[in-house]
């Protein structure tokens, strides 16, 4: 059966210069996000901080789990604040919230509050980032869908996720200087626990506020007519019907859930296991982990962006998932310092987080992009249970058992996507 014709190249009303500005803003936004990645990527830093406070593996996995559970909020925002004129405010205010809770973690450590209180604040940090990042990311996808043509989206993703991770490498080197006595960059700040975490969170908070300037610089084309309450209700109902009945959206969401569960939720256990493999007394290699994670992501980001311009959205889903499978095989088979390469492979594979929303956005009409990406986030919120599951498996049967579980989930996802997803999806109303 032949596949539908993909969207045309002129599906954006903005001029090439305005689209280039949006691509630049999108890339700049992600550069700052990546620069603060040791804090904004809820997982490794949070898990190791809670572990050093004396918590179990399950508690150490809670920030990542709570982050996932609370990513459903964007659905309500997309339903009740659908107007394109609200896109910029919906970028700015979540950034203010993220900066505030990040400062709160630094203050809790500075004031030498009890480990229990700091644990609660760190878990709350994961919760606030879960709600705020969910709104940010769904809004960004609508901005990109409205402000950049389909034919140029590969360039936007290539620049954002090729150049952006280089900034994460800088952030990781800074973290390594804070946490290790023999960092890669040759400079150590000599910070002991918990001052190293204090400086890390305190430095990230003001950088997050700079992102608001970029958020205000996007050019967003506004439709001539805003939907009325009644028409919006019909759009919501129709959008829900499409999301749960239209094949590219349904199987795209299922694939996303499986890949997220197998390739991202396991990351905390992979990091915790590094201490045993490397015989570390503390998480001194965490900066190296992050550097490799984002260094590989930068190389993969440029290559994958180019690959998207030459192939199709489905190829990107299979490619990123395959990279994650290779990463988990590395975790299971390699010991010693070479074990750290697994963070690079898994980091490169993490770009599934860009190409699954792209697949969903390509399958959606412009008015439904934010809602459909929000529904995808709702599906992703259940990944939090995978984080807790991996923690429980680790506590009972050991971390190796959790790694085998994650690898099996990824392989199942690849088989499903290869069999069920069309290569070039189009919105339901264009078929």
Question: Language-model segments: what does each one mean?
Answer:
Residues 31, 101, 116-136, 338-352:
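Hydrophobic core of transmembrane alpha-helices in multi-pass small-molecule transporters
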Residues 4-73, 78, 248-290:
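Helix-loop boundary and gating motifs at the non-cytosolic
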Residues 3-20, 221-253, 431:
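Juxtamembrane intracellular "pre-TM" segments in multi-pass secondary transporters
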Residues 89-105, 315-330, 407:
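Structural signature of the two symmetry-related core transmembrane helices
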Residues 134-148, 351-365:
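Intracellular juxtamembrane helix-capping segments at the cytosolic ends
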Residues 57, 150-159, 283-284, 364-377:
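Loop-to-transmembrane helix entry/capping segments in MFS-fold secondary transporters
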Residues 314-353:
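C-terminal transmembrane helical hairpin of 12-TM major facilitator-type secondary transporters
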Residues 73-87, 179, 299-313, 394-395:
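Helix-to-loop junctions at the C-terminal end of transmembrane segments
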């Amino acid at each position: 059966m032949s596949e539908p014709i993909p969207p045309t190249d002129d599906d954006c009303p903005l001029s090439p210069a305005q689209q280039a500005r949006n691509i630049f803003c999108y890339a700049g936004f992600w550069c700052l996000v990546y620069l603060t990645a040791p804090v904004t990527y809820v997982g490794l830093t949070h898990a190791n901080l809670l572990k050093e406070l004396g918590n179990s593996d399950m508690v150490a996995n809670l920030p990542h789990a709570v982050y996932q559970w609370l990513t459903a909020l964007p659905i309500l925002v997309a339903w009740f604040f659908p107007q394109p004129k609200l896109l910029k405010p919906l970028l700015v205010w979540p950034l203010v919230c993220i900066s505030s809770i990040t400062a709160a973690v630094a203050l809790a450590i500075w004031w030498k509050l009890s480990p229990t209180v700091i644990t609660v604040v760190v878990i709350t940090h994961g919760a606030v980032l879960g709600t705020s990042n969910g709104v940010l990311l769904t809004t960004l996808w609508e901005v990109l869908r409205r402000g950049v043509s389909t034919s140029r989206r590969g360039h936007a993703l290539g620049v954002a996720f090729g150049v952006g991770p280089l900034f994460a490498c800088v952030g990781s080197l800074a973290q390594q200087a804070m946490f290790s006595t023999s960092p890669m960059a040759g400079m150590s700040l000599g910070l002991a626990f918990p001052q190293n975490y204090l400086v890390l969170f305190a430095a990230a908070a003001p950088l997050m506020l700079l992102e608001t300037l970029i958020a205000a610089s996007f050019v967003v084309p506004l439709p001539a007519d805003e939907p009325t309450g009644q028409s919006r209700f019909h759009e919501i109902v129709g959008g829900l019907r499409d999301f749960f009945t239209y094949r590219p959206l349904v199987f795209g969401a299922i694939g996303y859930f499986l890949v997220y569960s197998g390739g991202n939720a396991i990351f905390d256990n992979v990091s915790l296991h590094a201490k045993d493999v490397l015989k570390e007394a503390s998480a001194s290699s965490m900066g190296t982990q992050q550097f490799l994670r984002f260094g590989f992501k930068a190389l993969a980001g440029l290559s994958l962006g180019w690959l998207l311009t030459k192939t199709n959205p489905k190829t990107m889903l299979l490619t990123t998932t395959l990279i994650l499978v290779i990463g988990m095989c590395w975790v299971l088979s390699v010991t010693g310092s070479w074990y750290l390469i697994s963070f690079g492979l898994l980091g490169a594979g993490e770009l599934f987080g860009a190409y699954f929303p792209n697949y969903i956005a390509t399958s959606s009409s412009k008015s439904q992009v934010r809602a459909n990406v929000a529904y995808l986030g709702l599906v992703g919120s259940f990944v939090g249970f995978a984080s807790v599951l991996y923690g429980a498996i680790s506590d009972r049967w050991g971390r190796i058992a959790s790694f085998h579980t994650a690898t099996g989930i990824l392989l199942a996802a690849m088989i499903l996507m290869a069999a069920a997803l069309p290569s070039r999806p189009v919105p339901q109303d264009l078929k």
